[in-house]
């Protein structure tokens, strides 16, 4: 499936993006190549191939859920102009 300049302009319009006229032919060529590759992948025989979430049979090693950093809230909030109950107070912007 070949994408022409008019289709690139239509896609750009639908995506609400501006494309320079001199770049349209390059985008048309690139999109045509992408669609050809997708078509090629669609023609691959995947019967009997087990779906997988990851190409390697690996598990994520999780560390124990332990506190590793000290609580520095008061230190960080010491420079704030207004704090209440551990929360930063900011000026009201909506009445």
Curated annotation (Swiss-Prot):
EC number: 6.3.5.-
Keywords: ATP-binding, Ligase, Nucleotide-binding, Protein biosynthesis
GO molecular function, one term: ATP binding
Catalysed reactions listed for this entry: L-glutamyl-tRNA(Gln) + L-glutamine + ATP + H2O = L-glutaminyl-tRNA(Gln) + L-glutamate + ADP + phosphate + H(+); L-aspartyl-tRNA(Asn) + L-glutamine + ATP + H2O = L-asparaginyl-tRNA(Asn) + L-glutamate + ADP + phosphate + 2 H(+)
Highest taxon, organism lineage: Bacteria
GO biological process: glutaminyl-tRNAGln biosynthesis via transamidation; regulation of translational fidelity; translation
Function field: Allows the formation of correctly charged Asn-tRNA(Asn) or Gln-tRNA(Gln) through the transamidation of misacylated Asp-tRNA(Asn) or Glu-tRNA(Gln) in organisms which lack either or both of asparaginyl-tRNA or glutaminyl-tRNA synthetases. The reaction takes place in the presence of glutamine and ATP through an activated phospho-Asp-tRNA(Asn) or phospho-Glu-tRNA(Gln).
Subunit field text: Heterotrimer of A, B and C subunits.
NCBIfam families, alphabetized: gatC
Xref: PANTHER family: GLUTAMYL-TRNA(GLN) AMIDOTRANSFERASE SUBUNIT C, MITOCHONDRIAL
Family as reported in the entry's similarity comment: Belongs to the GatC family.
Name of this chain's protein: Aspartyl/glutamyl-tRNA(Asn/Gln) amidotransferase subunit C
Lineage, broadest ranks: Bacteria, Pseudomonadati, Pseudomonadota, Gammaproteobacteria, Chromatiales
Gene that this sequence comes from: gatC
